[in-house]
Amino acid sequence: FITIHVYKYMMNRLIGYARKLLSVLEEEGIAFEHMPSGIDSISLIIREKHCPPEKLERIVEKYKQLDADSVTVDQDQAIVMLVGRGMTKTVGVAMRATAAFSKAKINIRMINQGSSEVSIMFGVEAKDAKASVIALYNEFFN
């Protein structure tokens, strides 16, 4: 995966800014996988195979034209999902998962949990993907 991080001070107060970011992806014919966000930032996670270097360069340039304070790109990323309906009523699931990553010396680049609490997405470096799955398996199933 590729993660494009767009930073803009007080982005949350700008009407339509996220739509403009997504419109750029639409113009390039690219769907996004996840879109974690904060007050000043949106991270767009897209499949690397759908975004060759020339498309990525155009996207970054268009985002800069939208007056972003900063646009950065992380390549060679992986997404690891922890999924389960029982997570909704279970205290400490995220803590156990992050502790498992820490114990395995895996740096978490991003965390996203939807309001349904059915899944937690962890962004890690691609080189750590297999070790991440093993760490979570050992924590929750061993």
Regions found by a protein language model. Give the residues of each.
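A conserved regulatory-domain signal marking ACT and ACT-like small-molecule sensing domains
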Residues: 1-142
